């Protein structure tokens, strides 16, 4: 059984063909999907997709790129979304200093607010970290009762070990298949029962499909790597 632990099914390239996308995933051996929200509105779209698909679950969160756009009361909306049974996690949340679409201080504020929601609801988190490992690990360590997954992991073995020590899982996506990727060496040092896989579709198509739109069925290339 393969679970695509992180995909964004509300993008038009997937949502407009959702039945066939799900069928191709099932044909490839993918039995469960997690549709991950990156802001309140997209989290609502994830929820809508799960209503007619028992094998799809969803999460609600605010991506660090979207942290600058949160409005008063957004936390209340997250709480309301998390009342639905199919909403299984808070995410995706975290820090991204690579592009800095949101000021780092705003990112940290929103990240902490959402970690507090996860702590309050006893829900796992889906973590996004890019060029922000030191700050992110520090914040995560402040919420010792919260566990989750470091999604689309692309950092060092040392960072992976820091996540593992905090009780987190490490999820690998199509970038592990890229030429000259260091990630095949990283994954060798991680206990198999702490490894997860994902597509992050419609992004990050694995080799040999790199450069094309991604979808859950292509997770088989990541698994085989």
Predicted ranges, named:
Residues 1-225:
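Mid-domain alpha/beta scaffold segments of enzyme catalytic cores
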């Amino acid at each position: 059984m393969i679970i695509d632990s992180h995909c964004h099914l509300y993008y038009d390239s997937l949502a407009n063909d959702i039945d066939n996308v799900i069928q191709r995933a099932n044909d490839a051996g993918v039995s469960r999907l997690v549709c991950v929200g990156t802001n309140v509105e997209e989290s609502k779209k994830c929820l809508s997709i799960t209503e007619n698909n028992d094998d799809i679950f969803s999460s609600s969160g605010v991506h660090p790129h979207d942290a600058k756009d949160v409005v008063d009361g957004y936390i209340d909306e997250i709480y309301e979304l998390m009342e639905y049974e199919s909403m299984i996690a808070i995410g995706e949340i975290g820090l991204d200093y690579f592009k800095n679409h949101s000021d780092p201080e705003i990112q940290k504020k929103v990240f902490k607010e959402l970690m507090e929601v996860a702590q309050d609801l006893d829900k796992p988190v889906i973590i996004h970290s890019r060029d922000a490992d030191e700050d992110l690990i520090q914040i995560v360590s402040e919420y010792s009762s919260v566990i989750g997954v470091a999604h689309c992991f692309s950092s060092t073995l040392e960072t992976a070990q820091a996540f593992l020590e905090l009780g987190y899982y490490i999820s690998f996506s199509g970038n592990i298949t890229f030429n000259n990727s260091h990630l095949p060496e990283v994954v060798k040092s991680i206990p198999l029962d702490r490894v997860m896989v994902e597509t992050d579709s419609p992004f990050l198509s694995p080799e040999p499909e790199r450069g094309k739109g991604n979808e859950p069925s292509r997770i088989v290339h990541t698994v085989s790597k």
